[in-house]
Structures are given as structure tokens and as C-alpha cells.
UniProtKB/Swiss-Prot annotation:
Organism ancestry: Eukaryota, Metazoa, Chordata, Craniata, Vertebrata
GO biological process: cardiac muscle cell differentiation; positive regulation of transcription by RNA polymerase II; smooth muscle cell differentiation; transcription initiation-coupled chromatin remodeling
Main location: nucleus
Official protein name in the record: Myocardin
Gene name of the record: MYOCD
Purpose of the protein: Smooth muscle cells (SM) and cardiac muscle cells-specific transcriptional factor which uses the canonical single or multiple CArG boxes DNA sequence. Acts as a cofactor of serum response factor (SRF) with the potential to modulate SRF-target genes. Plays a crucial role in cardiogenesis, urinary bladder development, and differentiation of the smooth muscle cell lineage (myogenesis). Positively regulates the transcription of genes involved in vascular smooth muscle contraction.
Sequence ranges of Polar residues compositional bias: 210-220, 347-357
Organism: Sus scrofa (Pig)
This protein's record includes keyword Isomerase: no
Tissue specificity comment: Expressed in the heart and in smooth muscle cells-containing tissues (aorta, pulmonary vein, lung), but is not detectable in skeletal muscle, liver, kidney and spleen.
Region: Disordered, residue numbers: 154-282, 324-365, 568-613, 630-672, 760-794
Length: 933
């Protein structure tokens, strides 16, 4: 292809050359072309060019001459405004310039005459002035007419006389709440100038009011310009300006109102600082007298209140003198006055709050950077501080209020004074070591009405729990509160008195020390109370041991015959005292906590420490349900054996997983000794610095019960248990946070599988989780299909039934654990359960559910034996006696009145049959637990 291309190009080139040669040969010569006129002759002589140039210039000259001949005369041109008349040219511009200069001079003079004076500029924050000078001007209300002449001011600045106008305007008192006074709190002259401001009750709008000159001058002497620092040159300027006013009055014919509009770009006057009508000015001596009387009355009222009730030690001294103070006092061991005053604590005397808005200063958030500039200014304005400046300056002005607010809750919710036997970490960190405290805790609650029935006179709870549980779900120590008589009053005062946002303006160190000493006394008393209760519990244990020793040997329970791994009670049940034998009809027996321990908050949940009877080792598993509403009464919730049977599924974060023995194994316990298996159910929600619910995950180490009889392990001492509890209480933290955020607990598949393989089925009638509460007698008749009479030895043991019921229902015993029972699949579920009960005990046991109001949660309580799928077990969730109104109705240790009645409690929150353990997610029971948080 390249050869062909090159040959082709060579051919074309040769052809082009031949054609070009032919054209060059045939073309005409230059002369021929010139003769034919195609091109000009190249060699024309120079004379030809000169002649041509001359002809062109002649032609141009001819045209000019022709135009000059034909042009119009000057008159026509002037008429047509092409030319101006030479006579009018010079005088007109000169006159115009003179007129223009005169007009400019007039305008300038007018503006100078009407421009605002320096004091006016200072008042409107247009002119930057030293703070002391500004406050001197504002404190004395030194005012000038706005149109004073500046030139005269400069000329007469040395004059010394005060004109009548000047004395009148200088002496008119301004309102204490005016923007001039509210900015006084930060200047170095706050002390003396504050008194001057507070004694004046007029307003700056009434400068021109005609008051008697002699009275005004005497007032001026009383107000005393001595401490005002640098106002003296200002006074000189003021006098000269007022003297020059009379001379220059003719220069201000115009109304100055339109000129004010030009200032709107320089200055922002907030709405609450705009000029308002104020009462007529008062004589300053009379005003001082009135304010002294007012102060005296306020102090008298406060002293009377403090005589009758203890005042909260954290209140600031200056706040006792401020108006609009509303004390929500709690008449218990200490009280917190929640004062809401619109005054800044920098002023120690009253200012009549005429110009300041009536907003109450709420608590400041912990981080001032989050606030916008407008919000910062609003807070400053409420507190009577200057609102000008950059954002950092505004935040610096607000910092003292933020530090002194003493409010543990950062949001602007209502603050309710709550008397819990609780020691939250962020409120009272120095009381964590106390065994039981009745400490005050400001729960910031956005719900205004606490969910507490006023009918309960023995509650020591006066307020609502925090919506975002600040320190975990606070459970309360179950001890008779020493302030029962006052609790109802405090409850009513907190319900009716409303919640006031406090601004506690500082905690004095002395009063802090007093509070700490009071707290120590309270701690000692509660410790003594706890010791007494522990002694009572030990006596109770001995009584139970004696009864256990006298009991005849019983047949083993058929439905509790599966082997269950046993956890060391000493390691996992720190607060449990001596184990007790629990009668068969109640699978959850009392575990005595060391009387309400506020430093270790009790778990709110249903963690019934289940003690099996002498025949069975029962593995109990932690189940926490922090329900907050009091109508979910937990009493009567532990009456059926299903209540404490639950599958050990790791899907459920509330259950501690435990692997049980083979389903077919049976361990018959022939000794009357009972083994108590508790898994550290006192989840020590003690005060720790971390907020959020904390649950202990004791990581149970269960030893397979090789022998039929398990020895009774003595519980550890109280101090050891507390130490164990403190280490365990933080292990469920992350787990619960993840659970709440993601909605499910990350389950260990292997452990889950092993647990599910070992859980047998229970034959019986299947029931949905929302089944209504059936009659217990029918249920148990249905359950006892082929039964051995497991409870025949108890048929005449009515007193023992009652003792068990008392144990299981006593509020001190309900540190409530849910026990996990592994049930052999080859045995009937509840053989002879109803037969074994004496009539009275059975009635007392089961009728409580029918006496009480209906089920209170979507998942109704249920007593029927329920068959589950191949991997399920019936679950019973019982609520701790946390919300019931009678759980604090305890008697002194010698008596058992508080433990006597079963029918006083309400039904449990819910009993649920989980039909599938693998499906154990938050959709069924966990929602009910978490919806209250």
C-alpha cells in the first residue's frame, strides 16, 4: 500500500508540474496587462504621484470652502443650543456655585444642630465610653436635650454653673430595672452605685418632668457623687452643654424624630428594655425608707421559715434578700429551697422590678457554647446583665451563674425535690459509703406530676423518677423510713407546690460541712437500723432451722426432679443471710437484704432468690424489670410454681445462662436440708460515676450437683458481699446499653444451643402469652393428671404455709429472684399440687389474684401449666415490691405486722409463657421492661 501511495503521489506531482509549465509559458506580459488596465503600471513616473496628491488636497479644500459658505449664522446656532450666548456664559455658573454652597452650608448647620449629644450617644451605646463614666451618667440619670450644639459644648466646657434645666434633668431618678441599671452588676463600682440605683424609682423617660428644684438638689446631695469615680468631667460637659442650649435653639427647627431612624443600624434596643411608662418619681428618702421596710419584712419572713424548717445549706446568702422568692420546702431531714428570682445575685439590695421582664432565670446548661447568641442575651437580660459584646464575653458573664446554679440536671425540665433512700453519684458523692441514707436528689423530670398515689402515707418518695435514669434505675432499700410522718406532707408539697426551676446561687462551704455532718448522723442511724434488721433476720433463720429440723422427711417433688447446677451461694448471693427451707407451695422465698441500702441501690427487678425445698437444688437467674409505675403491684406475684421457672436462654439479657444437667437425670434429696441457690440478685446499682442502668452479671460458676444432698453454704459477711457486689455491678453495663440501643442482646450461639438442648418439654395445656388469669384451682386440678401426692406431708401444716407466704411476701425478703427450674420431661408437671395444700393456705395463696384488680400489663399473669415447644419452658416474671404502696409499711423488728397479709399486694406485672426460647427477643417481655425507662 505504501508503494502504491508513493507512486500515486509522484504521478500527481509530475502532472502538476506539466500544467504549471504550460501556464507560465502562456501568460501575458506586464505591459500587456497594464495596457489592458488589469494592473496599474509598475514604473509610473513620480510626477504622476504628485499630481494625484495635489488633486486630493484640492478636493478637500473645495469641500471645506463649500461648507463654510453654507453654514448658518450664530443666532441660529445659539437658538439650536449648539453654541451658548457669550454674554450669559460667565455669570450663570458663578451664581449656581454660590447657591449650591449656601444650600450645603445650611444642610450642614442643620445636621450639626440636630445631631445627638455625647451623652445621648453614650446612652444609646453608639459611643464607646469607659464603664465607670457610663454608669455614673446612668446612675444619676444625667440627661441632655438631644439637640444640644457640639460647637457651643466645646466653647463653654470650662463653665461651672448648673442651669435649672440641668439640675432638674440630672436629678430625676430612673427606674431600677431600666437598661441603665441592669448593666450595673459588672462594673467595679457595683457596691456604692447599686445603692444609688436602688434608691431611685423613676424612669429615664421623665427627664423633662418639672420637679421642685430645691428638692432635686437635696436629692442630689443625698445620692452622693463621691463614689462614682470619674463622672466629674462628664458633669462639666453636661453643664456646658445645657448652657449652650439656649443660644442654639434657633438652629433646630426640625423635629428630631426622623433622625432616630438612622440610629437603628447602630443599636439594638431589646423589647424589654424599651422605654416604658413608670410611676411618678418618688422622694429618694421615702424610697429608701420603703425599701428598708421591704427588706426587713422579707428577712423576717425568711427567718420565720428557717425557724420552722431547716433551710437547704446550699442557698446563696444574697438570695435571701431577693424578691419573688418561692421556697418549695420539704419538711424532712433537710430541705431545698428552690428560689426563682429575676434578680442577679450581684446586687445585694432590691431594685423595683419595673423595667425588667418577669422571666425567672432558669438553670443554665452545662455547656454554654451550645447556646445561640440570642439565647445568651436572653439569659443575661433575665439576670439584669449587659447584653452587648461578643459571644465569649456573654458566656464569661454567664459563667458565675452556671457555676453557682447547683443544678445537677442540665436540661430545663422541672426540678422536683425527691426524698429517696438513694445516693446518686452526681448529687452526693461523699455519701456512697453509707449503708442507708435518706438523701435529697434533684431529679430533673419533664413529667410534671410524679406517678405516686397520695394515698400511701408511708412513702418516702416525693417526686418522679428521672426520665433518663441518671444513675440507673434507682431501687430503694426496703427499710422502715424514719421520716414516715413527714413523707406524706413532703409528697403533697411536691405535688401541689409544683416544680420550680431553681437557681441555687452557690454552695457555701460551711453549710456543706453542716450537711455532711447531718448525713453522717443519718448514716449512723440507718446503720444501726440495718444491724437490728439483720439480727431479726438471723432469729428468723434459726426459727426456720428449728422448723426444718422438726419437719418429717418428705417425698421429692416430681416436677422439680431434674438436676440443676448449683451455684455457690456465698459467691453469688452476697446479701443473703442464712438459708431457709422454703415450703413447696412457694418457690420464691425471702432473701434478706441488709436493710435498705441506699449506697448499694437494690435491683428494681423481679429477682426472686428461689430456695428450693429440701429435695431440689434450684438455680435462680437474674431477671430485672425496672418498672416505674406504682400501679404494677408486685405482691402476690410469686404464688405459682411457674413464676420462677424460666429457660436459661442467652437471648434474654436478664437471665444468667446456666447449663443444666441431662434432662433424664433425677436427684432425689432425702435430707430435710434445703439448698439455697441464689445468683447475686442484689444487683448493686450502687452510686457509681457512670450514669445509666447498671446490672451485675455475676458470671455464675455452677458446680454439677453430684451428691443428692447439697450442704448449706454460709453466706459471706456483709462487707465481703458489698465488695463482691461493687465489682460485679458494672459488668452488665455495656450489655444493657447495647441491648437498649440495638433492641436485642447479642447471643452466644454455642451456649444458646447447649442450653436449648438440655431444656425438656413440659406436658400440659398450651396457652398464649396473653392468656387471662385462670382460676388456680381448676388449673391445678387439670395439671394433676396422674399425680403423686407431693405435698401430702403439708396437708395439715397451715402455719408453715403461712410462714412461707410471709417469707416470700415480706418486702425485706423481696430482693426477688426468678428461679430457673429444670423439669424432667417424663414427669407430670404439677402432680398433686392442689392436693398438697391445706384449704386455707391454698385459698390465701391463689385468691389474692382474684381479689386484686385485673392484670395491669398487656401480658396477663397466668397460673396454668403450659406446654411449650421443644425448646421452651414456662416463664414467670414477677415484679419486685418496688412500686407497691405497701412495701415500706414495715414494722419494728420485733413484730411481723408488715409481713402478715398476702392480699394487700397487687398481681405481678406479667407472667408470660415463652413458646419459643429461640425467639426470646424484646418484642414480648423486654418491651414491657424497657418501656418504663
Amino acid at each position: 500500500m505504501t508503494l502504491l501511495g508513493s507512486e500515486h503521489s509522484l504521478l500527481i506531482r509530475s502532472k502538476f508540474r506539466s500544467v504549471l509549465q504550460l501556464r507560465l509559458q502562456q501568460r501575458r506580459t506586464q505591459e500587456q496587462l497594464a495596457n489592458e488596465g488589469i494592473i496599474p503600471p509598475l514604473r509610473s513616473p513620480p510626477a504622476f504621484h504628485e499630481q494625484r496628491r495635489r488633486l486630493e488636497s484640492d478636493k478637500a479644500a473645495d469641500t471645506l470652502k463649500h461648507k463654510v459658505r453654507n453654514r448658518s449664522d450664530r443666532g441660529n446656532v445659539v437658538k439650536m443650543h449648539i453654541l451658548q450666548a457669550s454674554s450669559a456664559e460667565r455669570p450663570v455658573p458663578a451664581a449656581q456655585m454660590k447657591l449650591k454652597r449656601a444650600r450645603l452650608a445650611d444642610d450642614l448647620n442643620e445636621k450639626i444642630a440636630l445631631r445627638p449629644g455625647p451623652l445621648e450617644l453614650v446612652e444609646k451605646n453608639i459611643l464607646p465610653v469607659d464603664c465607670a463614666v457610663k454608669e455614673a451618667i446612668k446612675g444619676n440619670q444625667v440627661s441632655l436635650s438631644k439637640s444640644a450644639d457640639a460647637f457651643a459644648f466645646e466653647e463653654d466646657s470650662s463653665s461651672d454653673g448648673l442651669s435649672p434645666d440641668q439640675t432638674r434633668s440630672e436629678d430625676l431618678p430612673g427606674s431600677a430595672g431600666s437598661p441603665l441599671d441592669t448593666k450595673a452588676a459588672e462594673t467595679p463600682l457595683a457596691g456604692p452605685r447599686g445603692t444609688v440605683q436602688d434608691l431611685t424609682l423613676g424612669s429615664e423617660n421623665e427627664r423633662n418632668d418639672s420637679a421642685p428644684q430645691s428638692g432635686n438638689q437635696s436629692d442630689l446631695g443625698k445620692q452622693g457623687l463621691g463614689p462614682l469615680g470619674s463622672p466629674l468631667p462628664v458633669h462639666a460637659a453636661v453643664k456646658s452643654k445645657s448652657l449652650s442650649d439656649g443660644k442654639n435653639r434657633h438652629k433646630k427647627p426640625k423635629d428630631p424624630k426622623p433622625k432616630v431612624k438612622k440610629l437603628k443600624y447602630h443599636q439594638y434596643i431589646p423589647p424589654d428594655q424599651k422605654a416604658e411608662k413608670s410611676p411618678p418619681p418618688m422622694d429618694s428618702a421615702y424610697a429608701r425608707l420603703l425599701q428598708q421596710q421591704q427588706l426587713f419584712l422579707q428577712l423576717q419572713i425568711l427567718s420565720q421559715q428557717q425557724q420552722h424548717r431547716f433551710s437547704y445549706p446550699g442557698i446563696h446568702q444574697a438570695q435571701l434578700k431577693e424578691p419573688n422568692e418561692q421556697m418549695a420546702r420539704n419538711p424532712n431531714s433537710s430541705s431545698a429551697p428552690l428560689s426563682s428570682t429575676p434578680l442577679s445575685p450581684a446586687k445585694n439590695s432590691f431594685s423595683g422590678q419595673t423595667g425588667v421582664s418577669s422571666l425567672k432565670p432558669g438553670p443554665l446548661p452545662s455547656n454554654l457554647d451550645d447556646l445561640k447568641v440570642s439565647e445568651l442575651r436572653q439569659q443575661l437580660r433575665i439576670r439584669g446583665l449587659p447584653v452587648s459584646g461578643t459571644k465569649t464575653a456573654l458566656m464569661d458573664r454567664l459563667r458565675p451563674f452556671q457555676d453557682c446554679s447547683g443544678n445537677p440536671v442540665p436540661n430545663f425540665g422541672d426540678i422536683t425535690t425527691v426524698t429517696f433512700p438513694v445516693t446518686p453519684s452526681n448529687a452526693l458523692p461523699s455519701y456512697q459509703s453509707s449503708p442507708s441514707t435518706s438523701a435529697f436528689y434533684h431529679f430533673g423530670s419533664t413529667s410534671s406530676s410524679p406517678p405516686i398515689s397520695p394515698a400511701s402515707s408511708d412513702l418516702s418518695v416525693a417526686g418522679s423518677l428521672p426520665d433518663t435514669f441518671n444513675d440507673a434505675s434507682p431501687s430503694f432499700g426496703l427499710h422502715p423510713s424514719p421520716v414516715h410522718a413527714c413523707a406524706e406532707e413532703s409528697l403533697m408539697s411536691s405535688l401541689n407546690g409544683g416544680s420550680l426551676p431553681p437557681e441555687l446561687d452557690g454552695l457555701d462551704s460551711e453549710k456543706d460541712k453542716m450537711l455532711v455532718e447531718k448525713q453522717k448522723v443519718i448514716n449512723e442511724l440507718t446503720w444501726k437500723l440495718q444491724q437490728e434488721q439483720r439480727q431479726v433476720e438471723e432469729l428468723r433463720m434459726q426459727l426456720q432451722k428449728q422448723k426444718r429440723g422438726t419437719c418429717p422427711e418428705k417425698k421429692p417433688l416430681p416436677f422439680l426432679a431434674a438436676p440443676i447446677k448449683q451455684e455457690d451461694a456465698g459467691s453469688s448471693c452476697p446479701f443473703a443471710p442464712l438459708p431457709r427451707a422454703v415450703k413447696r407451695q412457694s418457690n420464691s422465698s425471702e432473701e434478706q437484704p441488709a436493710a435498705g441500702d441506699a449506697a448499694r441501690l437494690r435491683p428494681l427487678g423481679n429477682t426472686h432468690c428461689a430456695e428450693s425445698s429440701g429435695q431440689t437444688n434450684v438455680l435462680s437467674s437474674t431477671f430485672l424489670s425496672p418498672q416505674c409505675s406504682p400501679q404494677h403491684s408486685p405482691f402476690g406475684a410469686v404464688k405459682s410454681p411457674q413464676h420462677i421457672s424460666l429457660p436459661p436462654s442467652p437471648n434474654n439479657p436478664y437471665f444468667l445462662p446456666a447449663s443444666s444437667g441431662a434432662p433424664g437425670e433425677e436427684h432425689r434429696v432425702s435430707s430435710p436440708v434445703s439448698s439455697q441457690v441464689c445468683t447475686a440478685q442484689m444487683v448493686g446499682l450502687h452510686s457509681s460515676d457512670k450514669a445509666g442502668p447498671k446490672f451485675s452479671n455475676p458470671s455464675p460458676t455452677f458446680s454439677k450437683s453430684a451428691s443428692a444432698v447439697s450442704e448449706i453454704t454460709q453466706p459471706p459477711s456483709y462487707e465481703d458481699a458489698v465488695k463482691q457486689q461493687m465489682t460485679r455491678s458494672q459488668q452488665m453495663d455495656e450489655l444493657l446499653d447495647v441491648l437498649i440501643e440495638s433492641g436485642e442482646m447479642p447471643a452466644d450461639a454455642r451456649e444458646d444451643h447447649s442450653c436449648l438442648q438440655k431444656v425438656p418439654k413440659i406436658p400440659g395445656s398450651s396457652r398464649s402469652p396473653t392468656a387471662a388469669l385462670p382460676k388456680p384451682s381448676a388449673t391445678f386440678d387439670q395439671a394433676s393428671s396422674g399425680g403423686q401426692l407431693a405435698f401430702d406431708h403439708y396437708s395439715n401444716d397451715s402455719d408453715e404455709h403461712l410462714e412461707v407466704l410471709l417469707n416470700s411476701q415480706s418486702p425485706l425478703g423481696k430482693v426477688s429472684e426468678v428461679a430457673l427450674l429444670k423439669i424432667g420431661s417424663e414427669e407430670p408437671a404439677f402432680d398433686g399440687m392442689a392436693d398438697g395444700f391445706s384449704g386455707k393456705a391454698a385459698e390465701e395463696l391463689f385468691n389474692a389474684h382474684e381479689i386484686l384488680p385485673g392484670p395491669l400489663s398487656p401480658m396477663h399473669t397466668q397460673f396454668s401449666p403450659s406446654s411449650v415447644d421443644s425448646s421452651g419452658l414456662p416463664l414467670g416474671f414477677t415484679e419486685s415490691p418496688w412500686e407497691s404502696m405497701e412495701w415500706l409499711d414495715l414494722t419494728p423488728p420485733s413484730s411481723t405486722q408488715g409481713f402478715s397479709s398476702l392480699s394487700t399486694g397487687g398481681p405481678s406485672i406479667f407472667n408470660i409463657d415463652f413458646l419459643d426460647v429461640t425467639d426470646l427477643n424484646l418484642n414480648s417481655p423486654m418491651d414491657l421492661h424497657l418501656q418504663q425507662w
